[in-house]
């Protein structure tokens, strides 16, 4: 980037006097700018023409002259940054941000949040870490899950926790509920403006079924075909009334068969790097088009507290500033996460169900969750598994715990404090707790988990929480060691029975009963939930927190720069 190189050379020269006038010569300036004297003369001419400085040199080699700086490197960097953004080249603009945090904040503050560029609304979000991926079957973080749902579509999607049409507008099943037809919308388009065809979706599903997790999620799918250019058919080995939910699952989002970065959702991926993610509105989306033109994640960890690590403490911010300034902004939406951090016990020889219930009772009665040394307002002890599904208080006959137990746990970092609290609690009751930490966000591919007596982790719950809990038991490797046991076989039989219940409310009640058994049986104990919050600056509207702790980009909008501003209301 030639402009950035010129700016860096100018800054090296400016730093010799911190912007004050200098008596110097061409040779000395060339040494500071790390270039030839000939090139330095060219730079001086360009800088004078651009109004960056004035130079009065004496004729003759080695003669001194006076240089007067008219602009500071900071001003020029800000100007160049704005020019790059106005040109829609955020990736180039990011190269200008190699600055100390305190200077970076001043430079970025006016550029974050909602901006109008060339009559186009753009939303910029500072984020504390690089995005892992957008491939639906590779991601683990809630930010990545949210982003994937903006880029990719499935046959169905979730709206208010229920499956509704996405690529398909309606579906039906035969009388026996073994055959399901999903009717596709006409004129569907990929992000590359290529028509989306039923045959492509069938090929994608057949490929997905080779994936271990997808094969567990769609375990009862025998075949997929396209009996018509606007229809996709599934044949099942047994009735499964979760099928429309399953097809809206993250694992069933459908990338383009040749280019996995291309989807058919409301937003198309334009740039993905460790420094910047940019998505743009898909003009030919089959549902309501987004009101913004682009959303950018600027990966700026310098602006966030490094001590937070991978903590959920990082708020979903669309404004920038230090903590004091954030307190002056209005929190536009907040909620308690449906997802929770959990503790799972594995009853076996040497660790009986009575002992697991005793452990649950000790945790509940000790109140250690509410006393964890975490920032106030970050978590709240779990009282309900889901709204209306209360966590039962264990009232068991206390029995001695085993002399030693092994705990395996994963991220988030708040579980570090929980593990330390458990070590201290169990020590008081004659039990030594061996602790093994896995720096991962899910249990896929973690073989030593079979050795664990106790497991702690984070169960993210987005849309359709009842279905999410059903699929958790079916697809998470966390539960695999339980399945060969008599209790595990009973749970699997109950799950198969539940999926064949046609009525939604009856199906939900049956799953509630199953989870109640897991909690009272000393297998599952929800520990705590998180508090989500979004801060927004003036002018950014339509922001409402979703179950992933983010907001629907397609509903956000930015007030146009009208002077004077006028009040407005939603259309009837």
Tell me the role of every PLM-derived stretch.
Residues 19-28, 33-42, 51, 55-57, ...:
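Ligand/substrate-recognition segments at binding pockets and active sites
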Residues 18-21, 41-43, 140-142, 147, ...:
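Aromatic- and charge-enriched surface segment that lines or borders ligand/interaction sites
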Residues 214-276:
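Surface-exposed binding/hinge segments that line
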Residues 126-173, 570:
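N-terminal lobe/hinge region of extracytoplasmic solute-binding protein
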Residues 48, 58, 358-392, 417-421, ...:
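Detector for C-terminal structural segments
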Residues 284-326:
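Ligand-site clamp/hinge motif
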Residues 130-144, 194, 243-249, 535-552:
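A structural "hinge/loop" feature
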């Amino acid at each position: 980037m030639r402009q950035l190189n010129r700016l860096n050379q100018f800054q090296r020269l400016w730093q010799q006097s911190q912007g004050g006038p200098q008596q110097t010569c061409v040779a000395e300036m060339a040494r500071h700018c790390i270039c030839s004297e000939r090139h330095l003369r060219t730079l001086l001419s360009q800088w004078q023409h651009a109004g960056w400085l004035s130079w009065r040199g004496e004729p003759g080699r080695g003669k001194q002259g006076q240089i007067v700086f008219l602009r500071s490197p900071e001003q020029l960097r800000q100007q160049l940054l704005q020019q790059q953004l106005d040109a829609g080249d955020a990736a180039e603009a990011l190269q200008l941000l190699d600055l100390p945090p305190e200077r970076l904040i001043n430079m970025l503050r006016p550029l974050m949040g909602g901006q109008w560029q060339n009559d186009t609304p753009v939303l910029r979000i500072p984020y504390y870490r690089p995005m892992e991926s957008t491939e639906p079957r590779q991601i683990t973080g809630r930010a990545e899950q949210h982003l994937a749902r903006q880029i990719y579509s499935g046959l169905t999607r979730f709206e208010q926790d229920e499956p509704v049409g996405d690529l398909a507008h309606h579906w039906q099943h035969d009388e026996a509920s073994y055959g399901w037809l999903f009717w596709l919308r006409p004129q569907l388009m990929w992000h590359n403006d290529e028509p989306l065809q039923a045959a492509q979706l069938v090929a994608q599903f057949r490929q997905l079924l080779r994936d271990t997790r997808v094969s567990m999620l769609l375990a009862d799918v025998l075949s997929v075909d396209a009996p018509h250019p606007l229809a996709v058919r599934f044949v099942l080995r047994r009735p499964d009334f979760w099928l429309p939910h399953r097809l809206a699952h993250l694992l069933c989002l459908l990338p383009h068969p040749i280019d996995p970065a291309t989807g058919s959702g409301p937003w198309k991926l334009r740039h993905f790097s460790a420094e910047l993610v940019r998505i743009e509105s898909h003009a030919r989306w089959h549902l309501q088009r987004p009101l913004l033109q682009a959303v950018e994640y600027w990966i700026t960890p310098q602006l966030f507290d490094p001590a937070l690590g991978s903590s959920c403490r990082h708020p979903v911010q669309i404004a920038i500033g230090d903590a004091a300034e954030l307190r002056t902004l209005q929190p536009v939406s907040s909620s308690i996460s449906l997802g929770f951090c959990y503790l799972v016990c594995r009853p076996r020889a040497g660790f009986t169900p009575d002992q697991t219930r005793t452990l649950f009772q000790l945790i509940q009665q000790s109140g250690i969750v509410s006393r964890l040394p975490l920032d106030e307002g970050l978590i709240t002890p779990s009282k309900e598994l889901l709204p209306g599904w209360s966590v039962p208080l264990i009232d068991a006959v206390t029995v001695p715990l085993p002399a030693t137990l092994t705990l395996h746990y994963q991220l988030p970092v708040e579980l570090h404090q929980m593990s330390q609290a458990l070590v201290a609690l169990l020590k008081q009751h004659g039990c030594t707790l061996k602790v093994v930490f896995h720096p991962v966000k899910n249990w896929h591919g973690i073989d030593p988990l079979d050795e664990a007596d106790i497991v702690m982790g984070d169960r993210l719950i987005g849309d359709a929480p009842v279905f999410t809990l059903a699929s958790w038991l079916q697809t998470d490797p966390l539960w695999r060691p339980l399945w060969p046991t008599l209790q595990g076989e009973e749970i699997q039989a109950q799950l198969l029975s539940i999926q064949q219940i046609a009525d939604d409310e009856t199906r939900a009640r049956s799953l509630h009963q199953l989870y109640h058994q897991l909690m009272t049986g000393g297998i599952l104990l929800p520990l705590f939930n998180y508090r989500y919050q979004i801060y927004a600056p003036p002018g950014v509207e339509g922001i409402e927190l979703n179950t992933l702790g983010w907001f629907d980009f397609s509903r956000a909008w930015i007030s146009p720069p009208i002077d004077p501003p006028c009040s407005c209301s939603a259309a009837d």
